Amino acid sequence: MISRGFTQSGGRPHAEALALGSIPDHGKPNSAAGMTMYVTLEPCAHESERGPACSHLVAEAKPDRVVVGQLDPDPRTNGQGIERLRKAGIEVVLLEDDASRKSLCGFLTRETLGRPYVTLKLATSLDGQIAMADGTSRWITGDRARAHVHAQRARQDAILVGGGTWRADKPRLDVRLPGLEERSPDRVLLSRGVAPDGVRVINEPAQINALEGVQTLYLEGGAEAAASFLAQDLVDEIHLYRAPIVIGCGRSALGDIGLEALGDAHGRWALAETRQLGSDAFTSYVRTR
C-alpha cells in the first residue's frame, strides 16, 4: 500500500484527494501511473468551492486501474465520475458488492431515501419477551451480548429510544468499551415531551429525516417505538439478541405494527449474519423490500 485516505468530517477533503496527496510526485500529471486505486464510492464528478471533482484529480494522476465499490447516487455524479476516468484511458472495475454497500449504507440511504439507515436492536427471551411483567429487564442477555451492543453503538451516528423507555430505565445510551468511550453516538428521544439536556427529540418517526449529521440511527426501543418505526417502514436492519430463557407472561418486544395479512410478513427480511455470544444468539436481518 502506497497511500490511503478517508473523507473528512464535514465532507471535505474527499478520500481520493487525501490519498493522491500522499503519493510521490503528487499533483503532477500521471503521478499514479502503474498503480491501482481502490475506492468504496465512485469519485465525484462535481466541482465545489471546497475542492475540485475527485474524478478530475484521479484522471490527472492516471492510475492504471480504479476499483469502485458503489456508484454514487448523487445525480451530480451517478456514473459520470466513472465515465470521466474511462475517457482518460483508465481501466475501471465496478463491484457493487455487499461489503462496500454495507460500509456506505448510511450515505446511500440518505442520498436515495432522504433519511438515516435505521437498525433496530432487540434483546429478547426465547419467547420474544423483553422484560418481566413488572418491567424488570436487567439483564436478559449476558456480558458478551451487551458488549457486542456497545460495539454496534460505536458505529452509529445516533441512538434513539422512546419516551417510555427513557422514563422507566433512564438509559445512558453511551459506549462503555475501553478505548471507544469517545465514540458514543448522539442521543435522540422519540417523545412529545421536552428533551433533556444534551438529547435531541423528535415527535414522530418520520422526523428522523431532519436529524442533521445523522446517516446511521440505532433504535433500541422500547416496544412501542420499535413498532412505530416498523409500521412506517423505516427499519432497514434488525439486530436480534436472544437469550436461552423463557419468561412466559412478560412484556413483548413489539407493539402493533399494523400487519393485516400473514402473507405480507413473508419475504421482507433476509438473514445476514448469525453468531454465538456466550450463551446468547445474535442474528441480523436486512430488509429485502
Region spans (language model):
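Enzymes that bind and transform nitrogen-containing heteroaromatic metabolites
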Residues: G27, E83, P116-R289
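Short acidic/polar alpha-helix capping motifs at helix-coil junctions
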Residues: A45-E49, E111-G114, V194-D197
